[in-house]
């Protein structure tokens, strides 16, 4: 069992699987929104920094935060560590992290892999490569 170590993933793991031993991998955390953290759309919408970021959220980093490619690289490195263990694993992670990894592995867009709390995907790997997935629960 793996989580990002952030509260939501810890709570979700406990709700789904109980008090199980697990590894916290900070590399599985969601995007660091930097200066935008804990601010609402209403607070940000008219700022130049937010407008610059929103113009290309896939490539522009949040001020003092991360870009989507930076997050994905961090997430992929963490998943490589999970896969290197060569065992079945349960990863309780964030929706954006899930979407980014699934897009990398299977193509498509982020909304193809939207998840609700407590849901996700079972991904089958062969020789370290993703070969199929199913949505859980169905």
Indicate residue ranges for each PLM-predicted region:
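Generic beta-sheet signal
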Residues: 86-96
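Phosphate-coordination/substrate-recognition cap region in phosphate-metabolizing enzymes
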Residues: 1-49
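Short glycine/proline- and acidic residue-enriched helix-loop micro-motifs
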Residues: 49-70
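A polyampholytic, Gly/Pro-enriched intrinsically disordered region
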Residues: 41-54, 130-138
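Domain-level recognition of soluble alpha/beta enzyme cores
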Residues: 108-133
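Short glycine/proline-enriched coil/turn segments at helix->beta-strand junctions
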Residues: 16-22, 84-88, 107, 128
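Short beta-strand scaffold positions
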Residues: 3-4, 73, 92-93
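Alpha-helix capping/helix-boundary segments
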Residues: 8-9, 78, 97-98
């Amino acid at each position: 069992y793996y989580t990002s170590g952030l509260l939501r993933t810890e709570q979700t793991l406990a709700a789904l699987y109980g008090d199980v031993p697990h590894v916290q991998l900070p590399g599985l955390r969601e995007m660091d929104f930097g200066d935008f953290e804990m601010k609402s759309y209403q607070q940000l919408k008219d700022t130049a920094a937010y407008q610059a970021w929103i113009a290309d959220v896939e490539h522009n980093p949040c001020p003092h935060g991360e870009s989507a490619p930076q997050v994905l690289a961090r997430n992929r490195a963490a998943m490589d560590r999970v896969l290197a263990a060569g065992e079945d694993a349960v990863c309780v992670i964030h929706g954006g992290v899930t979407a980014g990894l699934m897009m990398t592995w299977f193509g498509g867009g982020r909304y193809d892999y939207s998840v609700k709390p407590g849901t996700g995907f079972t991904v089958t790997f062969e020789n370290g490569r993703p070969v199929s997935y199913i949505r859980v629960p169905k």
